[in-house]
Amino acid sequence: GVTSEEERSGTIVFIDNGMSHCSNREQEGVEILSTRQAFEKYDWVKDYMWNAMSPEKDKYTAKTYLEESDGYFIRVKEGYKARHPVQTCMLIKRNKTLQNLHNIIIMEEGSSLEIITGCSTTHSSGDSLHVGVSEIYLQDDSNLQFSMIHSWGRETSVRPRTAATIGKGASYTNNYILLNPVGSLQSYPVSSLNGEGASCT
């Protein structure tokens, strides 16, 4: 389930391919939008679209690119240390659904955040496909702890595609937890260390 928002900096929820909820308790330092909202709000967001990952990586990234899929956009402003985690939830509600999301995370210089992502299906939607493209950008001396917690159906096919670029002195921790058997899972996250002291675990 979704944890009480009193213990979270913010929450964003997608059901199938549409955003159903977005809230933010730390607006002074954390920005939470849908990817499409961010693209419309800021001209510079286009510089982060398909920069960490090529849309030609495979057929799943290509489909995400061609459909201009929505997803979540999380930005932590320069020097800001978030007091609580941001939680995201991706739920597949309808059976035989293709959930296709494109997420962007930007950690500005010296910022810090923990993100907890929960992904699941309803009991009636197990025979579905989840594609989640996540591009993560850590500027110098930033810190991100990113945890995916998945609970899929036994017939669900899951194709997370994650790429991170990590600047000088920045630290990125990536955890993946699968709570129960899944039909098919294919994942190959890639991190690029782009400066002295950059680290990924």
PLM regions with names:
Residues 15, 22-33, 40-201:
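Conserved beta-strand/loop scaffold segments within soluble protein domains that form the structured core
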